[in-house]
Amino acid sequence: MKRRILVRGVLVLILLLALYPLTKFVILPLFDTSGELEGHDVPLYGYSEPDTSMVMENDALRFELDPATTHFTLTDKRTGHVWLSSPDNADSDPIALPVEKNKLNSTLSLTYAASTGMTTQFTSQEHSISNGVYEVLMQEDGSVRVNYSVGRVQRSFLMPTAIGDARMQQFMEKMTSKQKKDIKEYYREYNIDKLRKTDDKAALLAAYPDLAEEHVWVLRDGTKDHLKQRCESIFAEVGYTAEDLAYDNSRIVQAGSTIAKAVFNVSMVFRLDGSDLVVEVPLDDLAYDVDYPLTSLTLLPAFGAGGTADNGFLFVPDGSGAIIRFNNGRVSQRAYYANLYGWDWASIRTQVTNETRINFPVFGVSGDSGSFICILEDGASWAGIGADIAGRLTSYNTVNATYTIVHGDAYDVSERTNNAVYMFETAHPTGFIRQRYRFLPESGYMDMAASYRDYLTAKYPDFAAQTVDADAPLSIELIGAIDKVQQVAGVPTSVPIAMTTYAEAKDLLRELVTRNLAQNMSIRYAGWMNGGMNQQLLSSVRLIRQLGTQEELFSFAQNAAIAGVPLYLDGLTAFARDSGLLEGFIAFRDAARFTTREEAEIPEYSPIWYGANDDRDTYYLVKPAIAMRSVNALVDAAASYGAGVSFRDIGYMLSADYDSKNHTTREAVLHQQAEKLAELKASGRDVMIRQGNDYAAVQATLITDMDFDGGQYSIIDEYVPFYPLALHSRVSYTGASLNLADDAEEVLLRSAEVGAGLQYTLTAQSARVLQDSTYSEFYGADASLVLDDITAQVAQYRQTLSGIFNQEMTGHERVGNVTITTYANGTRVYVNFGYTDAAVDGITVPARSYAAQQEVSK
């Protein structure tokens, strides 16, 4: 049975009864159709094949596109290396099936869905180029644009399907004898008085009414495309025009159309920007029939693909960054795929077995002659990164990004049937998808990471100017209140239980200062208001009686300021937990919506059977406008105590609102969050975030709980400090709380490898208080039991790694079980992940430990 707060329920019922005379009830339709798109036929692009290649060139790069295939080459003029949009020998791949060969030969692939949810994949090679329904344009700004019509359509030819004899004779008079002979071979002349026994006279007259008055020439069934091309060429020479074709088609009853419903017009624009190739998809120009929603797009699926004879690796942004070596043989393991910024909580899911997430939008390829990174600039919030090795489906190693264009979820029509109807967004997003390919003469992953750092510092000047303390950052999280079900006047009621009161928080601060831990230390106080860790809607800030008085909280904040320890007050802004009318929350009004138009009510999931846990209360994702009001309430409350602000969700979780009446895309929410964080930074407000999505990391003061180990995909060969290199010396970051980690030793070693600070979570109360609660993760947080170990661990860490945290990371390598990270001041940090001592560079690194060699070079 779910926990219910009966007292609140009674109060709400009384209030509703009081309001009843003033209430007017209406029945609302389940589905709003005011925003539905009209179904329409998609016009096809005309076939265009210029005589010469499309070329763009600057001092660094040369781009050359073949209009016959839309394949292109990108030459790095600094090294002479040529990058290919598709492998040269894809058609002769010995293991690839035809569908995979088409993908390799395509610059674009897409999927669309039917109402049943079944998806179909199209590729530009099979469903556009081979049909000739595309065009290539050199634009006025020097960019190259390719317009694709992708679908199961026949190529249109500028020639008559059927034509009356009088008109045919006019054109034949201009033909050579050879051309006349060919036309007579490709067309059959029908005479109503001399039909064959197999001819259906009535059907012919119905299809070709002119046949009653004159002979009609009809293109023979089954004529191959190369013969149609010959006919088209002949008619073009004698002046046959589009107007002629329109007239001839008008004389045919139900002549048939080559336009199919499942056709998608998608454009790609290529432009050079210094040593970068920028690829764009203008979303405003997408066209498709609403009955066939375009669910995803993959751009340049095989760009830079490495073959079985090549040396190199794929870079994917898993954890701190990961490399997949070409041809590593792990074909029995699943291919790599992860979603940028994690799950969209406005999407329905019935179970959670494995949640993928990546925090920065970069992938890349490295080979013997150079490398590139691809940065997803616009539309990243809709993307996922996929990578696979040669030997599974093809003979090539590939990495690319796939974008979800139109989101959809299954709606259960009735409990009496297993059938479900899929409902989709009523419109696709606007703006652009934009990918920036940056080419490097170097092949190392740290060179690629340094290039990404250069990109961030150029894009965010304030981030470039940031500096941090030279000593290791230390983050201490204090847990204020949890909630437990207790008997109140004989009624089971969920009530806050103090784990660290305001006064106890001040005492812990004093203890930490006494232990000489205050240098570069920050404190995050979580669960301090609105019910505690199971935080109610942040429409306003309400202190928790069980934690103490406002004066005690002020005293804690003042003592932190006196000690020079930044205090961050933590809050949840995008969700409403344990909230109702008394907390200012009305689900029908305030909750975000799934694409099914249902309120975004989210269950807790069981770690045992992975499905929804009916014994736990559900909670709601709130509308973005409500979330931003919660942000402002939290910021104002923190400011009133002279504290910084810590977001439990912003910079970590990112969700859309698919309400058809007030739709907000995930990308729009991303920009809202980024703008708010930039505003806080500009005002001098200290901001702490979790995990560190890239758009938030550049605005943050401190990032905690960074994921260095990712999803531990078996296809991955090695994790590297790619993202830490881009951030190091400009923003402080830590991993997970060591005293709560499953493997604290591993977290410590990885922190030393990637130049991270340390984080710990503390409570003043004993772990016994956690019994009969849902907060077992805090059993290791009892300060009285762990502070001695924390003090020793932090002291050793700071002493060993002194002076590196304000230095740029310049290098990283692995020698056996030892990683070596180098910094701008010459310091080298050695981390031994092995279980025996290791000697490297003349020093011995103990097993499962770390060491540093200070300033061996400048």
PLM feature segments, named:
Residues 58, 65-77, 365-399, 576, ...:
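Active-site-proximal substrate-binding groove within the catalytic cores of carbohydrate-active enzymes
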Residues 26-48:
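Ser/Thr/Pro/Gly-rich low-complexity linker/stalk segments immediately outside membranes or between
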Residues 16-26:
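Hydrophobic alpha-helical membrane-insertion segments, chiefly the h-region
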Residues 299, 523-525, 569, 646-649, ...:
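Conserved beta-strand positions
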Residues 25-34, 55-499, 509-515, 520:
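Carbohydrate-recognition beta-sandwich/jelly-roll modules
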Residues 470-626, 656:
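Aromatic-lined carbohydrate-binding/catalytic grooves of carbohydrate-active enzymes
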Residues 1-15:
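N-terminal Sec-pathway targeting helices
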Residues 71, 152-154, 287, 527-531, ...:
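Solvent-exposed loop/turn segments at secondary-structure junctions
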